[in-house]
Amino acid sequence: MNNMNIEDFNNKRFYLFGSEWIINIVDNIEPEVDEDGYKHHYAGMTHNATQKIEIARSVKEEKLSNEMMCKTLIHELVHVICNTGAYFNYSNDEPFIEFMARGILSLLKQDLICK
């Protein structure tokens, strides 16, 4: 895990529950503006309709570290697992998704998950 380069995942395709997904590493993700006019900036985004994950290299013009981008990828992958498994309520629970992503990242760092 410690030598994982996030750029190696750019344009990587994978399959989950019969669906093909693609990971794109992008310079930034366009902020979303809510009904109150507040801009939401994201390090990652899962697009279920197009089966695409985007991971940003920077947020608000601040470059993200490789480790932060890897954590963000794991976070988005947990969203994909929940959504493709029809666990939509879990996918909408950001604290749960972040909790799972940090747990998986911790196991990866300890080389406890198969390579």
Regions found by a protein language model. Name each.
Residues 1-8:
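Short, Lys/Arg-enriched, disordered terminal segments
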Residues 8-67, 80-84, 88-103:
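Active-site scaffold of zinc-dependent metalloenzymes
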Residues 68-76:
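Short alpha-helical catalytic segment bearing the HExxH-like zincin motif
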Residues 106-115:
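Short, Lys/Arg-rich amphipathic alpha-helical interaction segments
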